[in-house]
Amino acid sequence: MKKTLITLATALVLSGCGSSPKEDDNTFTVGMEAAYQPFNWQTSKKTDTAVKLDGGAGYADGYDVVVASRIAKKLGKKLVVKKIAWDGLQPAVESGEIDAIIAGMTADKKREKGLDFTTPYYQSEMVMIVRKNSTMTSFNDIQQFSGYKVTGQKNTNYDTIIDQIKGVKHQTPKSTYPELVVALQQGDTDGITAELPVANGIVQANPDLAIVKFADGHNFNVDTAVSIGLKNNTRKTAEFKNIQKALDSISQEERLKIMEDAVKRAPTDK
């Protein structure tokens, strides 16, 4: 990483310009996993909402893709979507490979040390996904999962919050939600943490699973708002301000409708 940043800095000096080459580009390049429905997923179907994956097979679709498309249109630029593993998203912004992370990412304190975030573009709630035939479907307090095996996604808040459950059997996290679902269905874990829209999509595709919602005051203590991640120390730039302005032009009502539609068209095949 240090080598990458030094190389980038050298390139900027040699170019004789203090700004990123991206600023003069006519594209808005975003990164996402394309494996986190209904926020984002990969598909072979070309639709009105899907965008061709850059350098990859098929298309990207989902809530994040529609939001990114709206922003790109407002910026007067062509949207380019790159499929990047979760752990590679921040380095991709830092190196200039992408302009922004639009991938259901929460702006926590650790990430804010290396990224600048816009205001939230979606607010959700935390739930647990369990097997439909289990007694856990009646739970309404996270502490009822004490003694049970619970798993979350690797390198996310949704893994670290599991330790808020006293006596929980915190399992090794998985890299993607498809992996988590398989672990749950095979009995390797009893519950997986997820945001409600993600859980809705998973249960829609897997009728053998169910969602556990928690009562007020008995849920995880976690920020479930997701924001757009941009390169660090760019908050005062025209690029950041233009992206924020474009995001602000999407009303809360429109955002809810975009998510509702994304959940409906998310893949239901396992």
Task: Show the residue positions of the predicted features.
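C-terminal motif of bacterial Sec signal peptides marking the signal peptidase cleavage site
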Residues: S15-G16
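Extracytoplasmic small-molecule ligand-binding "clamshell" domains
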Residues: E23-G104, K113
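Periplasmic-binding protein-like
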Residues: A34-A35, Q123-V130, Q204-L247, P267-K270
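Bilobed "Venus flytrap"/periplasmic-binding protein-like clamshell domains
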Residues: Q37, A57-K74, M105, V127-V181, ...
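Extended ligand-binding regions for polar small-molecule ligands
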Residues: V65-K74, Y148, T156, D223-T268
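Acidic, polar ligand-binding/catalytic clefts
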Residues: K73, K78-Q144, H218-N221
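Alpha-to-beta junction loops
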Residues: G76-K78, E94-A103, Y148-K149, Q185-V198, ...
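A ligand-binding cleft/hinge motif common to bilobed small-molecule-binding domains
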Residues: G88, G104-G114, I161-Q164, D190-V222
